[in-house]
């Protein structure tokens, strides 16, 4: 388990897709939790087949009680998604993770270490949020169909990195237009151009 620095950080699994209005506010809250409160945050999502996932159990106040990796008898129906925020010092803790009974280095073990120090919070992704794990061919197809339907019906691009960077002031209008040129007259390139020119919906 490798973390590139010992600063507060976020980690997301590459085959996970998150979608929902206001998601950026949830991320900012988790980032603040890691940077200023020295606490880790995991994200819970209700599923019907919890035995397939890492699971988080919590009380009525949202306090985390336990985390388990693919339990035979799940204590809740809330899986732990592939998005994590950790405070400074995570590298040292990650180096202490030992292989599980399955012979793997489990992220759940790291989360349990934070829980034992009473430094683990869970943020639930409720109605209005979609979490898609694209780790199988079927789930990848489902995610592709979801993105296509949302994009066509609502006429907007889901998660355009350049558009997000422009929105938050990380790049300026000229840099966005330069990025758009790389995509030529493709729908994505035209979308970035429209955003830069203030013509996007």
Predicted regions and their residues:
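Short, amphipathic C-terminal "tail helix"
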Residues: 170-171, 175-201
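Short, solvent-exposed polar/charged micro-motifs at secondary-structure junctions
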Residues: 51-54, 131-135, 168
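Conserved beta-loop-beta/alpha segment of the NTase-like Rossmann-fold superfamily
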Residues: 1-60, 85-86, 94-95
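Residue-level recognition of short, well-ordered coil/turn positions
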Residues: 35-38, 119, 170
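Catalytic-core segments of class I nucleotidyltransferases/pyrophosphorylases
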Residues: 10, 24, 31-32, 63-162, ...
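Flexible, glycine-rich loop/tail regions that form catalytic "lids" or insertion modules at the edges
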Residues: 125, 151, 161-169, 194-201
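Juxtamembrane helix-loop transition sites at the ends of transmembrane segments
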Residues: 36, 157, 190-193
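Generic helix-packing signal
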Residues: 4, 34, 147-148, 169
């Amino acid at each position: 388990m490798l973390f590139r620095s010992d600063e507060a950080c976020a980690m997301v699994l590459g085959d996970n897709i998150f979608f929902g209005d206001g998601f950026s506010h949830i991320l900012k809250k988790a980032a603040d939790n890691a940077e200023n409160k020295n606490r880790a945050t995991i994200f819970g999502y209700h599923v019907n087949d919890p035995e397939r996932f890492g699971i988080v159990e919590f009380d009525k106040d949202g306090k985390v009680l336990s985390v388990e990796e693919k339990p035979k008898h799940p204590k809740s129906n809330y899986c732990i998604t592939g998005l994590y925020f950790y405070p400074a010092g995570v590298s040292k803790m990650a180096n202490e993770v030992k292989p599980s009974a399955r012979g793997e280095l489990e992220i759940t073990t790291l989360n349990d270490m934070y829980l034992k120090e009473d430094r683990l919070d869970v943020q639930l992704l409720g109605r209005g949020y979609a979490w898609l794990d694209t780790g199988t061919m079927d789930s990848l197809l489902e995610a592709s169909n979801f993105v296509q339907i949302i994009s066509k019906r609502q006429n907007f691009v889901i998660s355009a990195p350049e558009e997000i960077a422009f929105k938050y002031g990380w790049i300026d209008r000229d840099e966005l237009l330069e990025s758009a040129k790389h995509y030529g007259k493709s729908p994505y390139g035209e979308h970035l151009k429209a955003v830069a020119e203030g013509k996007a919906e």
